[in-house]
Amino acid sequence: MAAQGFLLIASFLLILLVLAKPLGSGLARLIAAVPLPGVAGVERILWRTLGITDHEMNWRQYLLALLTLNLLGLGILFCLLFWQEWLPLNPQRLPGLSWDLALNTAVSFVTNTNWQAYSGESTLSYFSQMAGLTVQNFLSAATGIAVVFALIRAFTRQNVHTLGNAWQDLVRITLWILFPVALIIALFFIQQGVPQNLSAYQPITTLEGAKQLLPMGPVASQEAIKMLGTNGGGFFNANSSHPFENPTALTNLAQMLAIFLIPAALCFAFGEAAGDRRQGRALLWAMSFIFVVCVAVVMWAEVQGNPHLLAAGADSSVNMEGKEARFGVLASSLFAVVTTAASCGAVNAMHDSFTALGGMVPMWLMQIGEVVFGGVGSGLYGMLLFVLLAVFIAGLMIGRTPEYLGKKIDVREMKMTALAILVTPMLVLLGSALAMMTDAGRSAMLNPGPHGFSEVLYAVSSAANNNGSAFAGLSANSPFWNCLLAFCMFVGRFGVIIPVMAIAGSLVSKKVQPASQGTLATHGALFIGLLIGTVLLVGALTFIPALALGPVAEHFSLP
């Protein structure tokens, strides 16, 4: 089993790096505002048609453009969901959503969280899925990438005040990166058996003679961008454990690769844009190290399983509960770590059924800020926040003003960095405390004891860090939970983006200082270790007490 796990991890990472490297080169061209080959003429027509100028924006204008787009999308999506019954492509005549569920779902998909307090096949029409959720899957992913584009330009430019044109970046990211790659993935899914139609649900008779209604819909097109954009919201309630979303071992591998593809490519793009590819590789090494360790821990925990299974007469203690037999323990464990290391949230197994330690690792990966590869764009700018914190700590130790890529890191940057890093832990801890203190919060818990608390902690962690996966066991479709999690999702997304853009605006105006003998090298093994230690230290200090009350207590309660 150990050899199989090692081969699975190694082959996954090898294929990922082979695919991510060329995509990173394309992203680097977009960061430099250089059109991809053959599209310059098309872009000129698009800019004239859409009324987009070449005028570059400062950080406030860039941020305002992104916020305007996302708030407009939030309002439109809320209306689509609330008045769903009056809109076309609703063959099952599904009613509109309640105001609190519509708000929660709209915020969820606009913020790239894709938390779902509903069952897709029994709640949403095809129009809501296509014109509402799928559109936001593209736009939320493009928003995250645009933010990291602006931050990278802040490091590579000097003595200016502009970070690019947000509208041009959004169009280029959507048309030349997200759409073509998603199209290729969708066609592959269709070839593997994922439905793509607008047919009404199909009544069938099973082999046992029972009647069943099979849901249909444009699944493949939404599934592709769901994974590529690290969105994660399933067309069906069972998400990627549903055979119509994830029918084969090949689609399972393709989905995991799609989740990490753009986050890994952005590391390569960062190195190219910075003029030193070692900088991007250093971040990739740090992410990969944490990722491999986490996968190994989850695989070990799930293979060791639960001793209660043997006592109940099972043939093995290996924890197959909540997992698809066609994927098995190892592939399910790898998928769980991939989807929570990135801010995706898609699942091919029920995380609530993992062992205590096996479920704690995905929860902790979310709590450290989704920086181990992370979401498209958000993962890299989140890790760069920890880079700034790491160089600040190193500067304190050696008595020098901290700097990164030749840019001095001053008080303003550190204030914004601290603010951005503290946003999600505050949301998680205060939100979980509020839920446990109120009757409305506790009434949704279906399990008592440490596991029940773990379900609450996981839900708030998932929302605040824009992941979207769930432990289940929590009746979250209530006004209290819909509003609480919507608030956590919105602030967890834009409460980080705003200080990140402020950091970009401050850095872009600074001069690049030449390296000296006292300059800390930020591409070697020493800095990689310092960066990993910073991430682990912040995560440990912040969440160990809460984790001790949940999964740790549950683990030690086993015989």
From Swiss-Prot:
It is a multi-pass membrane protein. This is Potassium-transporting ATPase potassium-binding subunit. It comes from Salmonella typhi. NCBIfam families: kdpA. It holds the Pfam family KdpA. GO terms for cellular component: plasma membrane. It is found in: Cell inner membrane. Belongs to the KdpA family. Coiled coil: none annotated. One of its GO terms (molecular function) is P-type potassium transmembrane transporter activity. Part of the high-affinity ATP-driven potassium transport (or Kdp) system, which catalyzes the hydrolysis of ATP coupled with the electrogenic transport of potassium into the cytoplasm. This subunit binds the periplasmic potassium ions and delivers the ions to the membrane domain of KdpB through an intramembrane tunnel. PANTHER family: POTASSIUM-TRANSPORTING ATPASE A CHAIN, POTASSIUM-TRANSPORTING ATPASE POTASSIUM-BINDING SUBUNIT. Its main location: membrane. The chain crosses the membrane at residues 5-25, 27-47, 63-83, 132-152, 170-190, 253-273, 283-303, 327-347, 356-376, 379-399, 416-436, 484-504, 524-544. Keywords: Cell inner membrane, Cell membrane, Ion transport, Membrane, Potassium, Potassium transport, Transmembrane, Transmembrane helix, Transport. Signal peptide: none annotated. The keyword Transmembrane applies. The gene is kdpA. The system is composed of three essential subunits: KdpA, KdpB and KdpC.
